[in-house]
A protein has these predicted regions:
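Short, contiguous acidic and Ser/Thr-rich linear segments
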Residues: 64-70, 449-472
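Short, recurring structural edge motifs at helix starts
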Residues: 26, 169-172, 457-463, 474
Length: 474
């Protein structure tokens, strides 16, 4: 079996190494039947993407983020946050001044990054943002924990938003609450504790899908035997222990536990098991079995999938990218560092479930069983948006939401970058000459000295086109 992808650059092709004649004539291989060999050819028309000339903005309307060395995990998270418009609008409305430096201010660095993602025509650097984190070059070449980065960034923004018009935005978007309870079986005693969360960690191992993980999350544990619960004045009692949800946030972030410690092998391992996640997630299912008695049953907890963050590789390294539906339409986009491409739903969902995949054996002379291989690319984080809140969250963000000083500063930076780019592109058309005029000769040599050399460091320079006629320059 062989294949070739024809393109404008490679429009002619011959399959010179299709199969050795000796193998074709070998009776045990089964290619010749009644002195006849059947050759099957398949032709498909596909859209060829030239990596070097590919323009993400032109093809998709979006631009990517540059990788500083090992910051692809951060890039996928930043793209996900940027494409939550309500969050982006709140970041733009954080108070910053023209005297702030992006490298020393997380809010300004994030505003600058988001502005460039929104208005640039090419990929955007994250160096200002990582400098505002206090990172050096070494940090940029180390992969950090995505969940930890998400929490630290949220905490810092939450703190910076206090006392401003956008105070409480992080909580409004991402904060939910659950109730931890212990209830005695034989006596009337119950202990409860309310806790908040900004994301939920769901088990992958032993769970078929997201619903199975939620079932496990609220699973009731029995406290009995040597593990009885001490119920204050009631002493040791048999009890039930569990968790139920009081409310879910408008933007639900689910961290899938793809990495865990293996006690048998005394090392961290990656769980590549097949794990399914739905396009729509109904957390009111089965009469609200995930909800506590205090939950508001008037709130409809039906969610639609917004982002799928993917890890490709093993426990000690790999690559991160994200599939995102910025407007929750049917069109998915893959954000892979600098490159943004359009993708279909199957690519974003089913192909990120993980597990094993079969490759059928196509050799007609052998009766082989299908070959299975483990898929090391799979989802590790999911972002869902509640249906009843999507019109508020997927809102319009335009220039009026951006501080004037930020627009002016970044527009100047953009113009200066374009000037340097144009100058570099046209550099081969120009040359620098120095011209010693009569005034220079008089000033440097004097009236009575005629043969000493002129100091050309002190005469004016001119940048001229190489093709410019002398008469025009004169």
């Amino acid at each position: 079996e062989t294949q070739h992808q024809f393109s404008a650059r490679e429009s002619d092709w011959g399959f010179t190494s299709f199969m050795p004649l000796s193998e074709l004539y070998n009776p045990s291989r089964g290619y010749l039947v009644n002195d006849t060999c059947v050759i099957e050819a398949e032709v498909a028309v596909c859209k060829v993407v030239d990596y070097w000339s590919y323009d993400s903005k032109k093809e998709t309307g979006y631009v990517g983020l540059k990788n500083q060395g090992a910051t692809c995990y951060m890039n996928s998270l930043l793209q996900t946050l940027y494409h939550i418009p309500y969050f982006r609008k709140a970041v733009y409305h954080m108070p910053t001044t023209e005297n702030d430096m992006p490298s020393g201010s997380i809010p300004l660095a994030l505003q600058s990054l988001f502005y460039k993602l929104q208005y640039n025509d090419s990929s955007v650097s994250t160096k200002e943002l990582t400098k505002s984190f206090g990172w050096d070059m070494h940090d940029s070449f180390m992969q950090h924990d995505v969940q930890e980065l998400n929490r630290v960034l949220s905490e810092k923004l939450e703190d910076k938003m206090k006392g401003t018009v956008v105070e409480g935005t992080i909580q409004q978007l991402f904060e939910g609450h659950h109730m931890n309870y212990i209830e005695c079986i034989n006596v009337d005693f119950k202990s409860t504790r309310k806790e908040s969360f900004y994301d939920l960690q769901l088990d992958v191992k032993g769970c078929q899908d997201v619903y199975a993980s939620f079932d496990k999350y609220v699973e009731v544990e029995r406290l009995e035997g040597d593990n009885k619960y001490h119920a204050e004045q009631h002493g040791l009692q048999d009890a039930k222990k569990g968790v139920l949800f009081i409310d879910f946030p408008p933007v639900l972030q689910l961290q899938l536990k793809r990495f865990e410690y293996d006690f048998m092998r005394d090392t961290m391992v990656k769980i590549n098991d097949r794990y399914e996640f739905p396009l729509q997630l109904d957390l009111d299912r089965d009469d609200g079995k995930y909800l506590s008695p205090d939950a508001d049953r008037n709130v409809r907890n039906l969610y639609t999938l917004h982002s799928v963050l993917v890890h490709s590789g093993g426990v000690h390294g790999g690559h991160y990218y994200a599939f995102i539906r910025p407007t929750l339409s049917d069109q998915w986009f893959k954000f892979d560092d600098e490159r943004v491409t359009k993708e279909d739903a199957k690519r974003a969902l089913e192909e990120q479930y993980g597990g094993e995949e079969e490759l059928p054996q196509t050799n007609p002379g052998l009766n082989n069983t299908p070959f299975k291989f483990t898929k090391y690319s799979n989802a590790y984080m999911l972002v869902y948006i509640r249906e009843s809140d999507k019109d508020k969250i997927i809102c319009n963000v335009d220039e009026k939401d951006i501080a004037e000083h930020l627009r002016i500063r970044l527009e100047k930076d953009r113009e200066e970058k374009e000037r340097r780019k144009k100058e570099k592109a046209e550099a081969h058309l120009y040359t620098i000459i120095k011209v010693a005029r009569d005034d220079d000769l008089t000033a440097q040599i004097g009236k009575d000295i005629y043969f000493d050399l002129v100091d050309h460091d002190k005469v004016p320079s001119f940048r001229i086109q190489k093709q410019m006629p002398f008469t025009q320059f004169k």
